[in-house]
Amino acid sequence: MPLSRLIVKQFRNIEACDIQPSSGFNFLIGANGSGKTSVLEAVYLLGHGRSFKSSLSGRIIQNECSELFVHGRFMTSDQFELPIGINKQRDGTTEVKISGQTGQKLAQLAQVLPLQLIHPEGFDLLTDGPKHRRAFIDWGVFHSESGFYDAWGRVKRLNKQRNALLKTATHYRELSYWDQELARLAESISQWRATYVEQLKEVAEEICATFLPEFEIKINYYRGWDKDTPYAEILEKNFERDQQLGYTFSGPNKADLKIKVNGTPVEDVLSRGQLKLMVCALRVAQGQHLTQMTGKQCIYLIDDFASELDSQRRARLAECLKATQAQVFVSSITADQIADMHDENSRMFHVEHGKIEQG
């Protein structure tokens, strides 16, 4: 479901742009600071309701402007052109419009415009804490299980209530009512996540083997508590410890994706270039799995394509992305870095001082 038109106004250094992207590869060529990453950021905002570089609306709205606009049109699977848009104010107020209707939720944007982002800071998926890998898992579960979004929101609220009660409760029975519902939802979320990871593993390990054939890569899911013990028992058994800590130690909020290379944690073995290839492999695998399960196509956003990758690795990634037949936006400093990826269906956009021109 590619974007057929992208309109950006008052976004960072982009005063206004209106482009018609290819359904295949789209190359954004320009010097550092030219605005090419801002185009990717605008597409990301359109699908997520937030920037991948800043959580503050004021930092992405153009200086001396009170708001920004990003609008797009994309082709649905039945060849219907669907308009979507987002408007952000400096105070953080956000308005989402889908098919002409205002008041839509950010989650609905994510449903209609699934995106995968690969950028220079993307190593955190593999090298930082488990929250990044939980977000990776939950992106897939969100798109495959209709009940996940509401259930996960409820779990986070129940956890917050439980943590507050831990500070005042004198006996476990004061928490048992809340814990029944928390345990029920946590078990459902854990099962959804486990099922998703099991399905994704086959695709991901195959692509990882293509990108990094010299390594044996294994991916496993950790649910956040002992796999042989019901969560309700964990909550009751750990009541006193949780009280001492002041928060709920075990649960779906501690889930993780364990990735090992030749039996060793991935961050202890791979170089930066190899880590980037693995991140790319995981993102592409997630997009392919989405297509297999739902028929939806991801849009891939790749910032600073050449970073950490030699020409051979770039060619390997380009070949894999072309095989997905998905829409891809790629930023690069020079056209030489993406020359091998260019074909008759791709489009090149030159970016300079926030001005975008097709060329």
Swiss-Prot record:
The keyword DNA damage applies. Its main location: cytoplasm. One of its GO terms (cellular component) is cytoplasm. GO terms for biological process: DNA replication; DNA synthesis involved in DNA repair; double-strand break repair; SOS response. Coiled coil: none annotated. GO terms for molecular function: ATP binding; single-stranded DNA binding. It is found in: Cytoplasm. It comes from the Bacteria. Keywords: ATP-binding, Cytoplasm, DNA damage, DNA repair, DNA replication, DNA-binding, Nucleotide-binding, SOS response. ATP binds at G30, A31, N32, G33, S34, G35, K36, T37. Belongs to the RecF family. The RecF protein is involved in DNA metabolism; it is required for DNA replication and normal SOS inducibility. RecF binds preferentially to single-stranded, linear DNA. It also seems to bind ATP. This is DNA replication and repair protein RecF.
